[in-house]
Amino acid sequence: MPLSHGQKPTACLALADGTIFYGKGFGATGETQAELCFNTAMTGYQEIMTDPSYAGQIVTFTFPHVGNVGVNPEDDETADPVADGMVVKWDPTEPSNWRSAGELSDWLASRGRIAIGGVDTRRLTRAIRQQGAPHAALAHDPEGNFDIAAMVARARAFPGLVGKDLARDVTCAQSYRWDEMRWAWPQGYARQENARHKVVAIDYGAKRNILRCLASAGCDVTVLPASATAEEILAHDPAGVFLSNGPGDPAATGAYAVPMIREVLEKRADLPVFGICLGHQMLALALGATTVKMNHGHHGANHPVKDIETGKVEITSMNHGFAVDSQTLPAGVMETHVSLFDGSNCGIRMTDRPVFSVQYHPEASPGPQDSFYLFERFVASMDAA
């Protein structure tokens, strides 16, 4: 909750333009610098903080109640939080949920992540929207000692995400097989037994629930690092290739990912390829399009997207700060989905091959499940190959 009169702040958020927000710190102590974004999801704070796509960002939650259902080991999208920090309106209360295994503050502290509560998140969200994902410094000091001028200077010195290949920081170190399926009551996460197609997933920062959706759809998934070569991928003789989500500037990651994708497409003309988020941007770059940095990005679980081919609207989960420039799509590549918020590109496909991708997250986690059909479409394309 907001600081009471005379209460000394124990956390401070300093924006690069000199705007200062004080509040109550929780989680780890110390300071971090990152790009600020806001997320409009009402649930799923644990999944959001552990989504590798948030590397290099401090997440502002527009929903005021964060932490009230605690944390648990099943909802992590990767082993540890990846987002650099958390900003909330109300500091977390004692959790109340049958799945809770601990408190948010303790979970953040044990993983070295700083958080601030008691912030006017409506005011901050407007600032993010108007300034365009500003850089910021977030500090937590139980004694409340902050060098504001130095924090602002460090926020201004943060290099930003443009030109940053963050996929290398969050990808797996070596290949592994994935057979865990989506969570279901009462058994939890079951193991896959009857796979239909061998799929190679390129890990640019893959969320666990994307891999679970692939396994649940009947894919025998082998995950390879972001640096995998076309030769290494094709050595697995896959029925399909999946390009995962991830953080950072797609143009930077594309320095090594784009040549690999092009070589795979050249050597296996019949190979189905499916991309999500950064994987969507990697595919677009490989096909000849370009990407651009967005003003404040799309982060939330309530983003309407129109399927141009069917006219249907899907409510989707999104997390990206870069977008494909649809005006640069070459012949033979069509735009399939657009955002109803700003008209930005949300999907493409090749017109003569089973190759397609979307900017949003069909696996949700958190978010709506309107777009699960895309995993089925990927499997159907392998059935037909």
Stretches found by the model and what they are:
Residues K198-I202, T316-S317, F356-Y360:
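Active-site-proximal beta-strand elements of phosphoester/diester hydrolases
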Residues G311-R353:
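Catalytic beta-strand/loop cores that center a nucleophilic Ser/Cys/Thr
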